[in-house]
Every structure is written in structure tokens, then in C-alpha cells.
């Protein structure tokens, strides 16, 4: 059992705490699942892009799935090799494309014909051949939250089969494009294996057709999306996921690229917060804590439910339903409704569980609240991996503008 009390002697709440041993094991589980075939596990930085987490994964020979030039430079800074980096995203700017090509990353996942011709023009100006992959939208329902579904025709991501074929043929004829991969990603927090296998089989069939047309594919990029159990719900077994994809690739000599994010880091993270007040309003019990929706947005944005437990001794206190809420001036600043918690006092400490993914990476300074301290637990030792922002950091980049006032 981890001794939180020692932690509270040196660090004030709220803060994030990550168990690096859990991250390491989660990544190694992916490597083991795909070991029967040439594969590259590209961690999706969007889930959590802390440099120390990236460095840990770099030492395990992880690749990186990046969706901005900032994420690419983060990956490189942490030691991930350029030839293990893929650049995804529906809205890459010309500057980002140029930088990515100059850095000689593995390839760019292309989302539209217009983006393809933009990459071609930039590659021509640089006098190089751009390695590209085309993201195919298989029009398959991932059966997940609509905000994180990406594989239906009404979603903004990828292109249909007909347009993908036209794009591949265009790239094949171009002196400045080199099509090396097919790509799909139907959504995040997936709990049903069937849509993933269906998409994999559909795109594998397309890949075979492309190879028959003389397109020299080398990679099969399956995206990510395996969900984690936030509320004890059924999740996809990694072995079944890997075997389903491997079976769909029979007859294809391609390296599999998998882009997990949430399933690598989610369960490693805790948000430690303390009670400021208890209040009752018209017989409704509220527990007000010092963390807010700016620190952890998922419950407010997705109505996501994360278990909350009390780590301050509370034996003998009466348990009753309550809403755990933050101090931000929004009614949506709620971490959990109808949580069954004991009567709490100011200073009592709570843990919000499984916040390693899309926690700190989605945090903001809303309400002029500094971003949180982040700590790592590794080999039974605690170290700081991101300092808490100071109040002065909130306006540091704005001070120059005051000189003209």
C-alpha cells in the first residue's frame, strides 16, 4: 500500500501521480501481443505527452503517433527516433508538413486529396520524396461516444474507399510522393472487438488491391482505440485484439503499426485532491475539492465516470450520496455525481482514479488557475516530472503587451 501521508508532507494538492511501472508493463503487453509479426507500437502522444513518460517509452523502443508538430518535437526531445514517428491529423498546416518532411519521420497519414497535393508541392520545393499513408474511413460504427468516434462517413477523418484509390494512384505516379502504408482508426475507448476486426478485414482487402496495382506498401497502420475499464465494464482482451488483426493480414507481408494511447497510460494515473468544504443545498450534498475541470476535463466534457476514493482515515463516518465538485465557475465542474462517500472534513484527501490519459494533456488555465504539479512513482521513489505553474506563469507571455498601454 502506497504511503500517501509522506507525499503530503512535501507536496500540496492538487497534483497528478503516475505509476511508471504500470506504464512500462502496459507497453510491453502490446509488444508481446504483436511479437508474432513485424510490428511497431507508436504511442499516441495526445493521451499524455509528458516528456518523462515519453522518455520511459523511448527506452522501450516505442514509436510515436503525433498530431501536431509540437508533439513531433516532444517525441524527438524525449529520445524517440524519427523513423518511428508517424504524423496524423486532419488539419496539418503547411509549416507542420514542411518541418515533418525535413525531420525525415517515418510517414505522414494523409486525410484528403487537397492535403496530398499540398504535401506533394512542399516535397517538390524541398527536392525530396515524401513517404505517405492514406487514412481510409471504413464507415464502420465503433460503438463508442460520438465525440471519439472517427470511422463513420459523417466523421471528419479519412477518405472513402473510392477516393483513397484515386489518391494512391496519384501518389504512385508522382515523383515527390511515396505511398508506403494504409491507415484506419475508427475511434477511441472501444469496448467491442467486432468493429475493429471488420475494419481491419476491409482495409486489408483494399491493401491487397493496391499491391496488385503495383503500389509498394510496407505498413498496415491499425490506429489505436482499445478502451479501459473505468466502471468495471467489459473491455477488449489485448490478445484477442492482436490475433484478430493478425488473422486479417494473412497473405500480406506488411509491418503492423499500432497506436495505443489511453490503454498505455490511463490506469497509471491518479489525481490527488483535498476537500475544501462540504455543503448542503436543498438537501443536496456537495463535496467541494481543490481540483477543477480545468485540471481534469473528461467528466465535464464526456460525462466520463472515474471512481473516487477517500485516502484519509474515515472509519465510523456516515456514508451518503454526494456530488464531488470543483471550484471553477461552471455548473459542469463536477467530477462525480451521486458518489457514496463518508462524511468529509476540510483537508481530507481524495483520489480520482485512472486519469493518466486525457487528464494533464487536456488541462487548461481556465479561471486563471495554474496547471498542476505532476509526480512519477518509479522503483518505489517519487520524482517531479512537471513543476506546478506559479501564478506569474499565468501572465508571463502577456506582460510585453502592457508596455504599450
Curated annotation (Swiss-Prot):
It is an enzyme of class 4 (lyase). Its EC number is 4.1.1.20. GO terms for molecular function: diaminopimelate decarboxylase activity; pyridoxal phosphate binding. The active site is at residue 329. It comes from the Bacteria. It catalyses: meso-2,6-diaminopimelate + H(+) = L-lysine + CO2. Substrate binds at residues 262, 298, 302, 330, 358. Keywords: Amino-acid biosynthesis, Decarboxylase, Lyase, Lysine biosynthesis, Pyridoxal phosphate. One of its GO terms (biological process) is lysine biosynthetic process via diaminopimelate. InterPro entries: Ala_racemase/Decarboxylase_C, DAP_deCOOHase_LysA, De-COase2_C, De-COase2_N, De-COase2_pyr-phos_BS, Orn/DAP/Arg_de-COase, PLP-binding_barrel. Its cofactor is pyridoxal 5'-phosphate. Specifically catalyzes the decarboxylation of meso-diaminopimelate (meso-DAP) to L-lysine. Belongs to the Orn/Lys/Arg decarboxylase class-II family. LysA subfamily. NCBIfam families: lysA. Homodimer. This is Diaminopimelate decarboxylase. It comes from Helicobacter pylori (strain ATCC 700392 / 26695) (Campylobacter pylori). The gene is lysA.
Amino acid at each position: 500500500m502506497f504511503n500517501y501521508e509522506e507525499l503530503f508532507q512535501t507536496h500540496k494538492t492538487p497534483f497528478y501521480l503516475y505509476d511508471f511501472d504500470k506504464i512500462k508493463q502496459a507497453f510491453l503487453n502490446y509488444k508481446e501481443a504483436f511479437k508474432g509479426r513485424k510490428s511497431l507500437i507508436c504511442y499516441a502522444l495526445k493521451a499524455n505527452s509528458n516528456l518523462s513518460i515519453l522518455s520511459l517509452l523511448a527506452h522501450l523502443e516505442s514509436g510515436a503517433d503525433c498530431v501536431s508538430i509540437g508533439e513531433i518535437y516532444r517525441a524527438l526531445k524525449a529520445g524517440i527516433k524519427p523513423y518511428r514517428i508517424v504524423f496524423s491529423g486532419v488539419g496539418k498546416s503547411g509549416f507542420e508538413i514542411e518541418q515533418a518532411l525535413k525531420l525525415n519521420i517515418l510517414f505522414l497519414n494523409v486525410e484528403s486529396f487537397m492535403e496530398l497535393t499540398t504535401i506533394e508541392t512542399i516535397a517538390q520545393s524541398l527536392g525530396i520524396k515524401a513517404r505517405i499513408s492514406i487514412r481510409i474511413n471504413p464507415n464502420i460504427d465503433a460503438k463508442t461516444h460520438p465525440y471519439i468516434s472517427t470511422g463513420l462517413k459523417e466523421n471528419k477523418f479519412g477518405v472513402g474507399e473510392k477516393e483513397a484509390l484515386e489518391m494512391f494512384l496519384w501518389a504512385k505516379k508522382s515523383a515527390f510522393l511515396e505511398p508506403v502504408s494504409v491507415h484506419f482508426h475508427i475511434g477511441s475507448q472501444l469496448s467491442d472487438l467486432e468493429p475493429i476486426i471488420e475494419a481491419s478485414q476491409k482495409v486489408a482487402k483494399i491493401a491487397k488491391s493496391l499491391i496488385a496495382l503495383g503500389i509498394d506498401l510496407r505498413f498496415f497502420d491499425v490506429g489505436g482505440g482499445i478502451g479501459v475499464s473505468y466502471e468495471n465494464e467489459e473491455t477488449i482482451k489485448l490478445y484477442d485484439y492482436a490475433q484478430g488483426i493478425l488473422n486479417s493480414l494473412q497473405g500480406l507481408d506488411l509491418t503492423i503499426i499500432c497506436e495505443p494511447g489511453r490503454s498505455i497510460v490511463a490506469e497509471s494515473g491518479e489525481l490527488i485532491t483535498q476537500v475544501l468544504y462540504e455543503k448542503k443545498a436543498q438537501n443536496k450534498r456537495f463535496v467541494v475539492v481543490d481540483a477543477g475541470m480545468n485540471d481534469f476535463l473528461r467528466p465535464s466534457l464526456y460525462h466520463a465516470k472515474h471512481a473516487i476514493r477517500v485516502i484519509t482515515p474515515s472509519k465510523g463516518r456516515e456514508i451518503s450520496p454526494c456530488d464531488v465538485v470543483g471550484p471553477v465557475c461552471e455548473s459542469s465542474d463536477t467530477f462525480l455525481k451521486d458518489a457514496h462517500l463518508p462524511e468529509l472534513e476540510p483537508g481530507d484527501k481524495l483520489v480520482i482514479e485512472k486519469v493518466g490519459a486525457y487528464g494533464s494533456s487536456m488541462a487548461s488555465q481556465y479561471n486563471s488557475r495554474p496547471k498542476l504539479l505532476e509526480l512519477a512513482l518509479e522503483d518505489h521513489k517519487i520524482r517531479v516530472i512537471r513543476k506546478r505553474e506559479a501564478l506569474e506563469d499565468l501572465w508571463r507571455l502577456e506582460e510585453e503587451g502592457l508596455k504599450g498601454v
